């Protein structure tokens, strides 16, 4: 049915207000998407948390990036990617983990290939159970068994430490928990155990470990094959730990690099477009952060309790607890 903007907006407003009056503010929900522009993400998040007064706004980006977010927070204290696209142009080794970059991130893949054309010695490794299009241009493909990334990178961590490749000055100055990581990955000290767990041949495993140990400028890009997993957070941390141990981070051409599954999953996190966040990576359950954001917004409300996350949100819809939902830029069906 054709309608006007005014009629559509008025109808939505009336329906939302009716639900709020009858069932409370948490009867309303928004399900948004990593395909929204950052500005749109910001406005809808402000509207829901500051003007509707609920935190029931979540995104399909949670399904692809929540494990990376948790890994970043556990490693760095905040959700931050310590690199930029320009770093790929300065790297001497690029490790692609759980990513068919050629198909899923073609623009970045072409950028990596262009960098390799200017620097033919750039060593590209693909870690993926399948032989994909990305593997065709790689120098080394590691066909890992599904779900064994933690064993692989814990094995790399132990190899780097046991063979004197730790940057002890960096570790002492900027990290904590080294002994705990060494203790928790003790099994992976045995490279035969890593071979068995990962399904990767000893020759390929040694080539990978030795090449990474000898290369200063290393970027490890990890994506959906890492994140969309029951062990996603641990996988992310096992990758990041190797960079922290060797100091291959915070330098031109060297960093762990989590790649989103959708074009603006990171933008959504920047503006707080999740049920448990406020804008600018502020914490929704922190009273000081609540005050800062509400004052900046000049809004009548500010959500103070985490809303329903993606899966729980749709369970609440099924249970009849959510009376109205606005779905933006995605098709969850």
Listing of model-derived features with the role each one plays in the protein:
Residues 1-264, 271, 284-333:
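Cofactor-pocket helix-loop regions in the catalytic cores of large enzyme subunits
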Residues 276:
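Expand to "…catalyze enediolate/carbanion chemistry for C-C bond making/breaking, isomerization
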């Amino acid at each position: 049915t054709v309608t006007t903007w005014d009629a559509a907006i008025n109808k939505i407003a009336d329906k939302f207000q009716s639900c709020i009056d009858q069932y409370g503010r948490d009867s309303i929900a928004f399900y948004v998407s990593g395909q929204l522009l950052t500005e749109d993400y910001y406005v809808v998040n402000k509207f829901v948390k500051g003007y509707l007064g609920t935190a029931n706004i979540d995104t399909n980006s949670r399904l692809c990036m929540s494990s990376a977010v948790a890994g970043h927070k556990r490693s760095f204290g905040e959700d931050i990617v310590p690199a930029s696209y320009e770093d790929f142009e300065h790297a001497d080794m690029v490790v692609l983990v759980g990513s068919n970059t050629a198909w899923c991130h073609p623009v970045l893949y072409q950028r990596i290939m262009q960098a390799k054309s200017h620097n033919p010695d750039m060593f590209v490794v693909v870690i993926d159970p399948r032989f994909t299009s990305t593997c065709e241009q790689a120098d080394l493909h590691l066909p890992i068994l599904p779900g064994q990334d933690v064993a692989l990178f814990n094995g790399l961590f132990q190899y780097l430490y046991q063979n004197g490749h730790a940057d002890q000055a960096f570790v002492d100055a900027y990290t904590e928990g080294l002994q705990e990581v060494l203790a928790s990955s003790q099994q992976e000290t045995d490279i035969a155990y890593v071979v068995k767990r990962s399904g990767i041949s000893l020759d390929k495993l040694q080539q990978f470990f030795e090449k990474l140990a000898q290369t200063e400028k290393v970027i490890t890009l990890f994506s959906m094959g890492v994140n969309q997993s029951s062990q996603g957070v641990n996988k992310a941390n096992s990758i990041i730990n190797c960079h922290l141990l060797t100091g291959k981070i915070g330098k031109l051409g060297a960093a762990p690099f989590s790649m989103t599954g959708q074009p603006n999953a990171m933008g959504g996190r920047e503006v707080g477009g999740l049920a448990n966040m406020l804008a600018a990576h502020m914490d929704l359950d922190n009273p000081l952060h609540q005050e800062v954001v509400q004052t900046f917004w000049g809004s009548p409300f500010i959500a103070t309790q985490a809303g329903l996350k993606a899966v729980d949100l749709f369970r609440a819809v099924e249970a009849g607890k959510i009376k109205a939902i606005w779905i933006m830029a995605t098709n969850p069906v």
